[in-house]
Amino acid sequence: MLQSPSSPYPRTITLIGMMGVGKSTIGRRLASQLNMPFSDSDLEIEEAAGQSITEIFARYGENYFRNGERRVISRLIAGEPKVLAVGGGAFMDEETRKLVLEKTLAIWVKADIDTLAERVTKQADRPLLIGHDVRTRLQELADIRDSFYAMAPLHVWTGAQPHEEIVDAIIMALPR
């Protein structure tokens, strides 16, 4: 594990990527190593709405959710620098994507489809996967999203390696 920097990173670091890639887990560890606060936009949305994301999708639909997501992410970015994990679809919204790319350091956290499928099948709370073959649906989403995620200036692969190694790789790649 790398020595923690003496001061936090001066900008918000936003972790983007597919569901199940580990943005929240890696984000918490990265924030700890950088002496920064951590926020997860999905958790912030659930807290603000008093409902789970699955419930929001079921009651109001994806467009309603994305509008709320945009507002929450905008508020989080406007605050103090932090490590921010955003939902897999957040970066598909043009306004959110522009804000993330202009105001934060975006890092695309990547994993292969088989790894993602293995991780998300353990979780029942993924509204975009309900009623679908998980691997097929993840591939469809990746086919749509990857070209947008690729706009992030930093990319990091995840897989079987320990989260500490991924965090160390991110810290070493941070522009200073």
Curated annotation (Swiss-Prot):
Cellular compartments per GO CC: cytosol
Annotated catalysed reactions: shikimate + ATP = 3-phosphoshikimate + ADP + H(+)
CDD domains, per database record: SK (cd00464)
Classification via InterPro entries: P-loop_NTPase, Shikimate/glucono_kinase, Shikimate_kinase/TSH1, Shikimate_kinase_CS
GO biological process: amino acid biosynthetic process; aromatic amino acid family biosynthetic process; chorismate biosynthetic process
Subcellular location: Cytoplasm
Annotated keywords: Amino-acid biosynthesis, Aromatic amino acid biosynthesis, ATP-binding, Cytoplasm, Kinase, Nucleotide-binding, Transferase
E.C. no: 2.7.1.71
One Pfam family from the record: SKI
Gene Ontology MF annotations: ATP binding; magnesium ion binding; shikimate kinase activity
Similarity section: Belongs to the shikimate kinase family.
Record NCBIfam families: PRK13946.1 (NF010552)
Name of this protein: Shikimate kinase
Organism per entry: Zymomonas mobilis subsp. mobilis (strain ATCC 31821 / ZM4 / CP4)
Lineage of producing organism: Bacteria, Pseudomonadati, Pseudomonadota, Alphaproteobacteria, Sphingomonadales
Gene: aroK
